[in-house]
Amino acid sequence: MGLLRIMMPPKLQLLAVLTFGVLMLFLENQIQNLEESREKLERAIARHEVREIEQRHSMDGSRQEIALDDDEDILIIYNRVPKTASTSFTNIAYDLCAKNKYHVLHINTTKNNPVMSLQDQVRFVKNVSSWREMKPGFYHGHVSFLDFTKFGVKKKPIYINVIRDPIERLVSYYYFLRFGDDYRPGLRRRKQGDKKTFDECVAAGGSDCAPEKLWLQIPFFCGHSSECWNVGSRWALDQAKYNLVNEYFLVGVTEELEDFIMLLEAALPRFFRGATELYRSGKKSHLRKTTEKKAPSKETTAKLQQSDIWKMENEFYEFALEQFQFVRAHAVREKDGELYVLAPNFFYEKIYPKSN
């Protein structure tokens, strides 16, 4: 390259640099176009598959409505928080759906926006509640909590979720935006090319690692109210806690994902029979690993922990962890380092009137 500079006149050197720059921009644009085309094709294929399923079940469009059995009239919604091992868990649901005879559907919102418009909320609630062909159904997507009773629905879905230590989640997301993961290693990420570590970002006061970026798990559980997305809102934290206890069937933590799966299998075998063994086999456990992730320094962690936002997100995480461990303590026992689900420990007696 040095010899080329000596031999080439300055004007030609400038022209070569400009040509190279234009070529790189062109290639990046082509890659982006290909990615958008792939996404459009995936959506078209998904719509085609849905139409085929509906036609298969329609019976000439005049089939009489027959009440579904309780085991069939079930909807699970997993409104997954980004970077909480959600892909690992969701792929277990995909692996089991054919064997356990249920449907899995991804809720694909534009640009992964967790807040739906009011009209989309109505369409979504009406659609999943009346879509008999997709029952029993397991829906998953990066969508904040939605209260179905607000729309006059008689039967609510079963909500589940997983959350993670707030700083660990943010660090994982920071590196994911830059280096991707081993699930789709060839995909170009939004911040690709930015080599700055998380520690360097915090030291420089960068926006991608600011304490405000911690504010995610609380609004996901709080829901679609405007105050939920007001960073640092005490009302949002209280509402998120209320929903976790009253609206969610079970909320696990990433750090104890196997126990979460075990409890789901024990309580909802219609969906999760075989899930624990599948997770333990290693085929899907920790499927998606963020590339080039570096643990933050003690100084970085201490700096983030000074933030009121971290204190609130951590309070919510500790609240969820305590609730999960309470549920687990009453459902399983440990023996020789292994957890075992408790057998049923109630029965009925003194039944009156006596049958003849």
Swiss-Prot record:
Record keywords: Coiled coil, Disulfide bond, Glycoprotein, Golgi apparatus, Membrane, Signal-anchor, Transferase, Transmembrane, Transmembrane helix
Name this protein carries in UniProt: Heparan sulfate 2-O-sulfotransferase 1
Record: residues binding adenosine 3',5'-bisphosphate: 83-88, 164, 172, 279, 285, 290, 293
EC number: 2.8.2.-
Cellular compartment(s): Golgi apparatus membrane
Similarity field: Belongs to the sulfotransferase 3 family.
Regions of this protein lying in the Lumenal compartment: 29-356
Coiled-coil blocks: 24-51
Gene that this polypeptide is encoded by: hs2st1
Main location, first listed in the record: Golgi
Source organism, top-level taxon: Eukaryota
Topology of this chain in the membrane: Single-pass type II membrane protein
Function: Catalyzes the transfer of a sulfo group from 3'-phospho-5'-adenylyl sulfate (PAPS) to the 2-OH position of iduronic acid (IdoA) or glucuronic acid (GlcA) within the heparan sulfate (HS) chain and participates in HS biosynthesis.
Disulfide bond entries: 201-209, 222-228
Keyword DNA damage among UniProt keywords: no
Membrane-crossing residue ranges in chain numbering: 12-28
GO molecular-function term, one example from the UniProt record: heparan sulfate 2-sulfotransferase activity
Active site: 140, 142
Family matches, as Pfam families: Sulfotransfer_2
Annotated Gene Ontology cellular component terms: Golgi membrane
Chain ranges on the Cytoplasmic side, renumbered to this chain: 1-11
Disulfide bond is among the record's keywords: yes
Glycosylation sites: 108, 127
Assembly behavior: Homotrimer.
InterPro entries: Heparan_SO4_2-O-STrfase, P-loop_NTPase, Sulfotransferase
